[in-house]
C-alpha cells in the first residue's frame, strides 16, 4: 500500500465524498458487466455519520476507497458492503487494507454477529477467505426482506427471483465468530476422552498443513 494513503473510520466530514463514491460504485459495476445493489449518496452519508464506514484518502484529501457496514435481523447478521477503490489506486493493496479495517470495526460493533457477503469479485473472495469467511448457500444468509429488496436495483435481480433467492451470480460467504471457539472446545473434549486418537489427529493435521504450505 502506498505510504501517503490513510485508511480510517469515516467521520461526518467525509460525507463530501458520498456522491463520488456512489458514482464510482455504479460505473465500476457497469464496466465489469456485473450487477450491484445501488446506493444513494444520502444512504452512504448516513453510514458515515453512524460511524459504520471505513474510508481511504490521500494526505492531500483525495478520495481513494470506501466500504460500509449493514446490519440485519436485529444485528444477527452483518455485511461489509459497497467495497470500492478509485481506478488509479487499484491493485495497490488498498482494498485488502479497507476490508481488514471494516472487518475489525464490524467485530468491535457486533462481536456476536455472523458476517456475510455476496460478491462476484475474485479479489474480494480471496480477502474474505483470508479473514475466515467460507462459501455457503444462500439459505444460510439473512432472510431479512429489506436486505433482499436491496438487490432490486441489480441487473441480475430477475435471475435471483427466478431461483427463489436460492442462487444467483454472486458467491455467498459467511464468517461465524463462534466457529473457532467451538472447534477448540471439540478438540478439548476428544483429548480428555482419548489422548492417543487426538495425538494422531494433531499429527495428521500438521502433515496436511505442511503439504498445503508447499503448494
Task: Give the role of each language-model region.
Residues 17-21, 43, 101:
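Alpha-helical elements of Rossmann-like donor-binding domains used by nucleotide-donor carbohydrate transfer enzymes
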Residues 13, 39, 119-120:
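Short beta->alpha linker loops
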